[in-house]
Amino acid sequence: MEIINSLLDKIYDSTFPETCRARLSDAIRETRDALTHPRKAHWDEKDVVLITYADQFRESEAPTLRTFSRFYQQHLQSSFSLVHLLPFFPYSSDDGFSVIDYHHVSAICGDWSDVAELHQHTRLMFDFVCNHISSHSAWFKHYLAMDPGWDDFFISMPPATDLSGVTRPRTSPLLTPFEMADGDTRFIWTTFSADQIDLNFANPFVLLSMVDVLLDYLAKGADYIRLDAVGYMWKTPGTSCIHLEKTHQLVKLFRAIADEVAPGTVIITETNVPHKDNISYLGNGRDEAQMVYNFSLPPLVLHAIHYGSARALKQWAASLGVGSGTTTFFNFLASHDGIGLNPLRGILPETEIVSLVRDLAAEGALISWKNNPDGTASPYEINVTYMDALNKKEDDDDTRLQRFMLAHALLLAFPGVPAVYVQSILGSRNDMEGVKVAGHNRAINREKYAISEIEAALSDRKSLRHRVYHALSALIQLRIRQPAFHPDNPMEVLESDNALLVLSRPVKKHDALLCIYNLSGREMTYSLPENQRYRNINNDERVEGDVPVRLAPWGWLWLKR
């Protein structure tokens, strides 16, 4: 508790009430003493994460978590050792990220017993939506009713307050008017939408309430805790209100509580920002998040395949450095959100980012924008399935599959823990009808299915879904058998033509896995080190080092020395 108490003093400038401190200490101790589920001590090459909604599949009147559990056991368990269940709580908007009640499971998904049943078959990652809560929540209703004890739970500002320096991830107003019980209007801080009300962590009782949520998730067995939109948690008018020091201290506090209650729990921060700011949430390697999303990877892989050049990807990959052993990257290509562009800024010139946006928009992708402090707007996200991002409308399925598998062979070779979005393992295309129905761009990559529809598609040998599912499942299962892909193993980027990316993942001093990728649409060759023999682990064929290897368009090889 010493670390926890020290952080409380830093966050609240030594004014944290002793009654709150005692309550917090009691809650931590009670949760720790009641916990029976041990966490995995450390990550390894066998860890691959599936990202999915809890209501991804429907089956008559059955709770969707039960349907998912059956599908997972039949089709996914051999590939994925951990499931990230996107928010499965009652919500009012944003497909789960405007939570009405943190402590209950949405009725359509089931209840906590269904979560526990799934947990018998896989480790689980929960979302801790810690920056904001739904305007339909009991907490906000108490606030609007002006009930005693709720006055400072949220942040109100005079509408004339100069907040021009605040970093904005959206084009919606930062302050939203709400009528209070006495008839007055207050303008409330809403970073993401009028329905998502920012919590006021400067109020110690807000912290206590949110720590209760964290402890509940730990008690329910969460192995990974994802801190959603965490960069915006602490607000100080006159600043950018992102990545503030007290925000980092809050993350450190959540980490310290998880370490105290359930050692081995992984804290992962979701900060879709430039790379330098993103990795700042790893702290000193032992005191903040254990993982950060590798947000630069999805747009850089897309950029490389789109233009047939690994130049930018190669330079960035060479700068990643060696993992500390106590922190690592959460690598992914697609998720429930779009492909973020902010993580490209500082890596690619703005002209190249805009060019990529225009090219993909011409092929049917949707673009989301953010407001800048100078009054301009910039593209911040490309909304598209990763399958359609990589390909043109007129491409055939053979080409689609080739590019898609190239991208995922890259994903699975990078240092870190890889994660695959459910729409990717299912080979999904853009859901334009879903966008019309939902009225927002992100619905393009969030389609939900009748379980019978998906199982029929996976049984159809000619369907793209069948081909993607079997090819990607086989690739993941090959990956988890390679000790070279342990997240903590170093990676070396080797010299090559800019159309190629060549990575070496050493296991021992004279043993390495060589990963060679052709990002272009033309055949390429690569000269291996002479006097070396390799084995192609994809087909078990021997490869002699004195003969250049040929790579088909968008082809790749994993060679074991």
Stretch-by-stretch model annotation:
Residues 1-532, 538-561:
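Active-site and adjacent substrate-binding regions of carbohydrate-active enzymes
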